[in-house]
Regions:
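Extended serine/threonine-enriched, polar tracts that run as long, contiguous segments within proteins
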Residues: 25-28, 175-179
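Short, small-residue-biased leader/transition segments that mark boundaries at the very start
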Residues: 1-7
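Glycine- and other small-residue-rich loops at beta-strand/loop junctions that grip anionic moieties
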Residues: 53, 82, 179-180, 208, ...
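Conserved, mostly hydrophobic/aromatic
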Residues: 77, 163-164, 172, 205, ...
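Active-site glycine- and acidic-residue-rich loops that bind
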Residues: 85-88, 114-121, 152, 178-193, ...
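Short, surface-exposed basic-aromatic patches at helix termini and helix-loop junctions that form
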Residues: 67-70, 94-99, 191-200, 286-293
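Active-site pocket-lining/capping segments in soluble small-molecule metabolic enzymes
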Residues: 25-31, 109, 122-146, 161, ...
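Active-site beta->alpha loop and helix N-cap motifs at the rims of alpha/beta catalytic domains
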Residues: 8-166
Length: 301
């Protein structure tokens, strides 16, 4: 992909670098435990999201968040509604993140897997006012530009409307954190739809870091992202490409161009899903943030 792509326009260079300068990366407690520390791996300029998967131990999430904060990172733990068993556990988790870890940012999601307790949605968590009580300053809410196979389109739209309504009375900043996608077209079409819903929340666009085409197809399939599966499958018609590392160069360039061409866009930040490994994504970021270098064809001239 894009091996000949060059960015010569100064506006594009500046926009690409701005998008990448304050981007975020996602990790799991197990990945962090594997390295023991991220100080030599990830720039402290990058926010780090800590996942809370359905089978994860809550204390491991808290411990990972605490250690990352001590290393100087701005940490954004996941708060999955359907994984939390009850409101007492919810309070314990939020309180620990705020008081023990020093977190002031959080991502509220519905959560995968079967429901473990009586909390069914992210809006229920927002309406408890626990995030205000424990002084969270920035709260992301999950969203799906290409839809969610487990949720009806009407319900996805209604969730966007509800979260916008809640944001008007919240005393913290809210934003939309997207599921990953592979084409800028997905974001463009989705934002046009959001405009019809009178969305006023900023968008943090989720995209994959460098990974093999085979790995990306696997993740897209497991998440049921139809448009992305079709897009990747076309590239995989040549079986020799399956093991090829696909980096996000062109997607970043296209998103930067979209930002320039649409000054009213709510797209503000990039979030990386490190499907090919956090080391690979971090190395890619460190390289492309140096304007005199190129990496995998992304050239700043």
């Amino acid at each position: 992909m894009g091996s000949e792509m060059c960015i010569r326009d100064s506006n594009n260079i500046e926009t690409v670098l701005n998008l990448l300068s304050n981007c975020s990366i996602e990790t799991t407690p197990n990945v962090y435990a594997k390295y023991g520390s991220f100080t030599d791996l990830v720039s402290t300029k990058n926010n780090i999201y800590v996942t809370y998967l359905p089978d994860e131990d809550m204390n491991k999430v808290i411990d990972t968040a605490k250690k990352l904060k001590l290393e100087g990172y701005s940490v954004i733990p996941h708060l999955p509604a359907r994984t939390i068993t009850n409101h007492e556990e919810l309070k314990k988790y939020v309180q620990a993140l705020a008081e023990d870890c020093g977190c002031s940012k959080i991502l509220v999601i519905g959560g995968g897997g079967s429901q473990k307790g009586n909390i069914t949605s992210s809006i229920e968590i927002l309406e408890t006012d626990l995030l205000s009580k424990y002084n969270f300053k920035e709260v992301g809410v999950a969203c799906h530009p290409e839809g969610n196979p487990d949720v009806k389109k009407y319900d996805l739209d209604n969730a966007i409307i509800q979260k916008n309504q809640f944001s008007r009375k919240a005393d913290f900043k809210m934003y939309l954190a997207t599921q990953f996608f592979f084409e800028a077209k997905s974001l463009k079409e989705w934002e046009l739809h959001l405009n019809k819903l009178n969305n006023n929340l900023d968008i943090h666009a989720g995209i994959p870091g460098p990974a093999t085409l085979k790995t990306l197809i696997s993740y897209a399939t497991s998440c049921g992202i139809g448009n992305s599966i079709r897009f990747l499958s076309k590239q995989a018609l040549n079986i020799t490409k399956l093991a090829t590392i696909r980096s996000p160069d062109k997607l970043i360039y296209d998103l930067a161009s979209y930002q320039i061409e649409n000054p009213d866009t709510k797209l503000k930040k990039i979030h990386f899903y490190a499907f090919g490994g956090i080391k690979k994504t971090s190395e890619w970021l460190k390289t492309v943030n140096k304007p005199d270098l190129s990496y995998n064809g992304l050239k700043f001239e």
